[in-house]
Amino acid sequence: ISIFFFAGTVTFTPFFNTFFLSVQDYVMTNLDGAGFIGLENFKNLLHDATFIKAAKNSIVWTVANVGLQAFFGLVVALLLNMRFKGRGLFRALMFTPWAVGGMLVALIWSFMFNESVGVVGDVLNKLGIVDGKMSWFSNGTSAMWAMIIANTWRGIPFFAISILSSLQTISTDIYESASVDGAGAWTKFWKITLPLIKDTLLMTILLRTIWTLNVVDIIYSMTSGGP
């Protein structure tokens, strides 16, 4: 009971305090002049250009990050669940990015996206996708995608290890029975694998959504909050 009381106190007290302040005309330089104004602050917020832009960026950032991490994490988990020589080594190497701190991830990818010596721009040039040097951090769109790529690289291992642990609980007898019935690889995935890992996948998506919304280190280290 004491644990629930403590958790409730540290969770709900700040929430209600914040809501109480949000419905008042609260000015830091005039603490005694606060007065109740209802939902006026929320109305003003919805017409604030900076807030709207920040909200849009947050949605793009979260959806792109979680979507890419979920897709590639699932692919990696399926590959690592197969039997092949050196699987243990590949698993260890695959999970390395998750152990790297956000500041170091930002440093690595900032160097890779560097206009002069970055390997990303060089590869895109050789593939004919871009012509000449590309300054990734000179505009908001390319800077956003540079950060998304960096954070996706860091987050894929978490999806992979979560999904892989769920895949390993599925009995091979189910797949063998499906093969006897003539089911192909695609049918097995949609009818057996995906339904059985659905709960794990949804929980992982929920966790990564919360964590992605709270990412600060990569964003600030790569762009200092801009452009």
Segments predicted by a language model, with ranges:
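A structural signal for multi-pass alpha-helical bundles of membrane permease subunits
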Residues: 1-227
